[in-house]
Amino acid sequence: MRISTANTFDNTVSTLMSRQLQLQKSQTQLTSGKRISQASDDPTGAAQAERSRAEISRIDADNRALQASQNAMTLSESGLGDATDILQQIRETLVQAGDGSYTDTERKALATKIQDLRSQLFTIANRTDGAGNYLFSGQGSGGPPFVDQNGGAKYVGVAGTNQTGVFNGYPLSIDGRLAFEQANSGNGSFVTDAGTNVNTGDAPQAWVDTGSLIDPKALTGHGYTIQINGTAPAQNYVVTDDSSGNVVASDAYSSGHAIQFDGMSMSISGSPVDGDQFTVQPSTADLHVFDVLDRAVAHLTTPARSGAQVSQANATDLRDIDAVMRNMQNVRSQVGETMNNLDNTQTRMSALKLNAQTEKSNAEDLDMVQGISDFQSQQTGYQAALQTYAMVQRMSLLQFITS
């Protein structure tokens, strides 16, 4: 077969250009560190890299939302901690107020202190995140969630929580009702209180304590009335179920001794008179922090109270303060649990992002060791081809004959 010189030249030039293009491509890959610079380089790999980039973008957006939630929950947890500290100060003040030697003037001074602490607590309830968003507004953020009216503080936020996030809903606020308005009244199971004297209509001359639950299974959820009958020292008590009218317990009365019935235990202290009544009602989840403080102030500013009235009011106020503090601490614990969940979610998101970045790198990044090796091999081949071509070009039939 006869091959013309022109044909040989064309084939050689084509081979050289192909090797040069391969060399340029390898050089571009080494410079960028990318195996794929355009989709045509590897359509399958390019598609995988694009999916990974989209995943990373979604994770980054969700992470920004999560960080906003972490900031809001941190501030909320701090606010609930501050609120609990203030309630503890109020409790200590009420313990002072229970001193039987205090005068009306001294108790009024304690009431003023409680009012000042109440104002601080109200400010915390309307605290923002620094960007104008109210921490305890629930789903509403257009204005302060709590307003002070003539009838006391009122929650005007929206039930629930604001949420953000792409993959999950991350809370940006706390439902202020849960923290400030939904404590369980009494001891959490039932509520004791002084009634009136069935004969005179006056307040009892004794007081009832908070009581305790001794058998949860025996609770009926009914209301009860405890009545003292007779005159000291031959007095007795009778406990009547308000629902049925049946007597469920009765015995001789002794100051400070336990009165037990239907899974509950409590004691009445002091010197009651014939006809004094006390009430027991089921606990309800509607105890408002600010209502508790307002009642405590009202009690402390009421003059000329009897010793029994002071003791009963003080026992009630301390019981209610303890109840709202327990509730505040429970909500704070829930926020702390949310913060832990957010931290765990952030850890998982970091792992997902790392996985997406790895997949993206595997799809489009260049193996530098292999890339350098390929480049050197292509460079050597290209140089050899150039040298061979140059040598062939210098050869001719005349040179062959004369050599």
Task: Show where each model-derived region lies.
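Amphipathic alpha-helical polymerization modules
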Residues: M1-Q149, D294-S403
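Cysteine-poor, low-complexity segments in flexible/peripheral regions
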Residues: P144-S306
